[in-house]
Swiss-Prot record:
GO terms for biological process: DNA-templated transcription; regulation of DNA-templated transcription; symbiont-mediated perturbation of host apoptosis; symbiont-mediated perturbation of host ubiquitin-like protein modification; symbiont-mediated suppression of host innate immune response; symbiont-mediated suppression of host type I interferon-mediated signaling pathway. This is Protein E6. GO terms for cellular component: host cell cytoplasm; host cell nucleus. Residues 1-28 are annotated as: Disordered. It comes from Human papillomavirus 14. A zinc finger (unnamed) spans 58-94, 131-167.
Length: 171
């Protein structure tokens, strides 16, 4: 009976020295941990596995990304989402749905072609533009094509959006 009283007393007094040591160790180890990778290639390199073996779930639908979606994710320069020590990405369907949602909910303004340079005060080559359909970064040729055809650039959630060469053919 005395053992039950002492275990109750020690629980009331707070954490035992052993558990506080573990807490301190966990805190110290978090300072020593390398930063979590932002790309799937970076994750594969960290884990020392081939890219083909990376199975990453979509943050929105929960399906695992296909190999093609894994490659597209890094090519689009999107960042992995870390929740604790679990990693998530975004599949092609959810990426398109997210882009559409952002455009519909957070649209700010539209400029035509070369007007983007006067609005931003930057050369078209220095303005980051993502596709408003698939979220790919546009390259210089795609941005110049939009300028030359006097197509719109849209400001959405503080970032510029245009249409990439791939999505342009589906409209």
């Amino acid at each position: 009976m005395a053992t039950t009283d002492s275990s109750t007393d020690s629980a009331d007094e707070g954490p035992s020295p052993k558990s506080s040591y573990c807490d301190t160790t966990e805190t110290k180890s978090s300072f020593l941990e390398p930063p979590l990778p932002a790309t799937i290639c970076g994750l594969a390199n960290l884990l020392e596995i081939p890219l083909d073996d990376c199975l990453i779930p979509c943050n929105f639908c929960g399906n695992f990304l296909t190999h093609l979606e894994v490659c597209e994710f890094d090519q689009k320069k999107l960042s992995l989402i870390w929740k604790g020590h679990c990693v998530f990405a975004c599949c092609r369907v959810c990426c398109t749905a997210t882009a559409t949602y952002e455009f519909n909910e957070f649209y700010e303004s539209t400029v035509e072609g070369r007007e983007i340079e006067s609005v931003t005060g930057k050369s078209i080559f220095n303005v980051d533009v993502r596709c408003y359909t698939c979220m790919r970064f546009l390259d210089s040729i795609e941005k110049l094509d939009i300028c030359g055809r006097k197509l719109p650039f849209h400001k959405v959630r503080g970032s510029w959006k245009g249409i990439c060469r791939l999505c342009k053919h589906f409209q």
